[in-house]
Amino acid sequence: MERGMESEAFYGLSARGWDGSEVSLGSFRGCVIMIANVASSCKFAESNYKSFAGLLDKFYRKGLRILLFPCNQYLGQESRPIEEIRGEVSKKYSDRFVVFDKVDVFGKGAHPVFRHLVNTKNGKGRLGNFIKWNFTKFLVDRKGCVVKRFGPSDIVKEDDENLLRSIEDGENGMQNS
């Protein structure tokens, strides 16, 4: 998919927020975005949530936004109500997370956000466009293009070159800060 088309397709997507409101990804135009499918009972939860909170502490003012999409498809590891999930991650890790309603990330019912992400050039993983587990992460630049896909056990660090390049690129022109 051509970058301009990828960008417009991304910003044209929306998802239901934890409170039931429809949230347009276009509202994050100009921000660097990390999108992850999450599950609180997953063995990767603690390390990823701590990493995300640290990234927000360092880069929130520079336009980083982390969008969490709870998913119960993998061994039922996110079976709690969405209000509980949001409450826990907000209290224990960061109140800056953007938490969405539960979604499916694979199969016929896969949410359009994840269908889009896995079908971009940089959104494919080792298994092609299949998301193999919780905490698969997608880094999206300020133009709405997927820069990198991280696996469930990959902990995104503050010095990750793709993250730093995305943060630095266009920082002065960012919106939604």
From Swiss-Prot:
UniProt keyword Oxidoreductase present: yes
Top-rank EC class of the record's enzyme: oxidoreductase
Function: Protects cells and enzymes from oxidative damage, by catalyzing the reduction of hydrogen peroxide, lipid peroxides and organic hydroperoxide, by glutathione.
Name of the protein: Probable phospholipid hydroperoxide glutathione peroxidase
GO molecular function: phospholipid-hydroperoxide glutathione peroxidase activity
EC number, as in UniProt: 1.11.1.12
Transmembrane regions: none
GO cellular component term of the entry, any: cytoplasm
Alphabetical list of CDD domains matching this protein: GSH_Peroxidase
Coiled coil: none
Entry keyword Oxidoreductase: yes
Record keywords: Cytoplasm, Oxidoreductase, Peroxidase, Stress response
A single GO BP: response to oxidative stress
Intracellular or extracellular location(s): Cytoplasm
Highest classification ranks of the organism: Eukaryota, Fungi, Fungi incertae sedis, Microsporidia, Unikaryonidae
